From Swiss-Prot:
Compartments, record wording: Cell membrane
Gene name for this UniProt entry: psd
Site (Cleavage (non-hydrolytic)) location in chain: 187-188
InterPro entries, per the entry: PS_Dcarbxylase, PSD-A
Cited function: Catalyzes the formation of phosphatidylethanolamine (PtdEtn) from phosphatidylserine (PtdSer).
Organism listed in the record: Streptomyces coelicolor (strain ATCC BAA-471 / A3(2) / M145)
Molecular function, one GO term: phosphatidylserine decarboxylase activity
Protein's pathway: Phospholipid metabolism; phosphatidylethanolamine biosynthesis; phosphatidylethanolamine from CDP-diacylglycerol: step 2/2
Descriptive protein name: Phosphatidylserine decarboxylase proenzyme
Cofactor (UniProt): pyruvate
Modified residues (Pyruvic acid (Ser)): 188
Upper classification of the organism: Bacteria, Bacillati, Actinomycetota, Actinomycetes, Kitasatosporales
EC number of the protein: 4.1.1.65
């Protein structure tokens, strides 16, 4: 049974469910496409603009999609759609699972466990491509959740194009597992730190679906 979502209403356009925070990018693109299509029959310039503008608008609609998910019942679920880029033991005994999100993935991130958001910290930084090691110094938002497994850290990392991270919930919010917590625009990465003793049940190269793919093993 999926968990209920109690977050504020998302942006919408023509019945398409869109990610919150999409409007500043999407509305001008769709408006340009609509105007150029209306004028295409009377203007050669508008006709020339209509095709790429419409293609760009369609791409934006696809990128900012925010599908409903039936949340998997398990201790830890993936916070992001994408591909597992690396699984690394950390000095403090935790395990870091890094998930790379391409521009083709859904970029709405979800809570890996139910709990309380104890910290949401924006850290300024660069914009190196998210698949590079140097991306660890990129602009990012660091989350901490108080859960049944203790403190869970999740980091949203901006990429070369993804220069805007949009948190959906503030510190102190109680979230359900799989609840939407934020958006990263245009290609990026999410790092999830599992506490010592939690065994990973995904492997490098494996595709993940936010709220659906189980990350840990019983």
């Amino acid at each position: 049974m999926p968990h209920s979502q109690t977050s504020a209403p998302r942006d919408s356009l023509a019945g398409v469910r869109l990610a919150r925070g999409a409007s500043p990018w999407l509305l001008p693109t769709v408006a340009t496409a609509a105007v150029s299509l209306l004028r295409a029959r009377r203007s050669g310039t508008a006709k020339a603009v209509a095709v790429p503008a419409t293609a760009l608008a369609a791409g934006m609609l696809w990128f900012f999609r925010d599908p409903e998910r039936e949340i998997t019942q398990g201790r830890v679920v993936s916070p992001a759609d994408g591909v597992v880029q690396s699984i690394m033991p950390w000095k403090d005994g935790r395990t870091r699972v890094a998930i790379f999100m391409s521009p083709l993935n859904v970029h709405v991130n979800r809570a890996p466990l139910a709990g309380t958001v104890t910290s949401v910290e924006h850290v300024p930084g660069g914009f190196v491509p998210a698949f590079n090691k140097e991306s660890e110094n990129n602009e990012r938002v660091v989350w901490h959740f108080d859960t049944e497994l203790g403190d869970i850290e999740m980091i949203q990392i901006a990429g070369a194009v993804a220069r805007r991270i949009v948190p959906y919930v503030p510190q102190g919010t109680k979230v359900e597992q799989g609840e939407r917590v934020g958006l990263i625009r245009f290609g990026s990465r999410v790092d999830l730190y599992l506490p010592e003793g939690v065994e990973v049940d995904v492997e490098v190269g494996q595709k993940t679906v936010a709220g659906v793919t189980r990350i840990d093993r019983d």
